[in-house]
Amino acid sequence: MKTAITSLLVTGLLLGAAPAPATAQASGPDPDGPSLVVLVRHAERAGPSADDPGLTDTGAQRSRDLARLLGDAGITRIHSSDTRRTRETAFPLAGQEGLEIEIYDHRNLEAFAAALLAMPGRHLVVGHSNTTDEMSVLLGGASHGPIVEEWEYDRVYFLTPRPDGGMETVMLRFGPVPERP
């Protein structure tokens, strides 16, 4: 039931992100910008002791859940920081949709946000606990507060352009409920 409700919410959000008719006012969303940006933190990582850890089994399942959730979203580009855990989170959707994973510098979010706002299409951006919420704000969306580094892997942000040039932001949770320490 919860999955069905989430699917209905996402479908409604995506339908609301359809391109505006040609008669839209010039002050509306940039037609050369994104029609949808989806932001997620990487899935559960396999331990902080490794230099570049991959995903746990739970994280791998969450990445597959993400691909299932976004399978009908029409994602046209996938962006990931250059870490194994973010690439592994993006991989199921990239494989399913036949898309390349484009690497961005998560240490220079302002430049990436500016570039993203000039890219048409529907984007998935896979980041980190300290970048995902900040990226929402840099894109003109809302903050939903800091992500708890130790356990919070289930947030997904959907950003769609508003007529005033900002971004409408909806934050949902997906996949298995994370285990809190």
Predicted segments — roles?
Residues M1-A4:
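Positively charged n-region of N-terminal signal peptides that target proteins for export
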Residues A18-S27:
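Signal peptide processing junction and immediate N-terminal pro/mature segment
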Residues A26-L116, P120, T131-E149, D154-P181:
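Active-site-proximal alpha-helix that buttresses catalytic centers in soluble enzyme cores
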Residues T6-S7, P29:
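Short hydrophobic/aromatic segments of transmembrane alpha-helices and their interfaces
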Residues S7-A17:
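Bacterial N-terminal signal peptides
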Residues H128:
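Conserved alpha/beta-hydrolase "nucleophile elbow" surrounding the catalytic nucleophile
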